[in-house]
């Protein structure tokens, strides 16, 4: 894993997983709506807008580095988080167009999740 990340986030895995799970309730099968993560100092705002409705939730985090707004397919994030046993996960992000890495301190696992382009004006 390259040490060139711009943003490092420590977050409670269960809180993040539950929040993304709730967001997927607003997305129909085949609908490719991304979940938008807006990361600021002590907060990650997760939002999704779909034809069914919209959601906007906040989760407390510990962040090092720059603020970032990035979009992901919620299903890919859920798939990775479900197989991690740790209570806390660490996310490493470079920019909104580069992959996000999820890994533990001992590097027993590394998950790579590709971001999704989104129009910030509509989300």
In which residue ranges do the predicted regions lie?
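DNA polymerase processivity clamps
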Residues: 4-123
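Active-site loop ensemble at the mouth of alpha/beta enzyme cores that anchors a bound cofactor
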Residues: 1
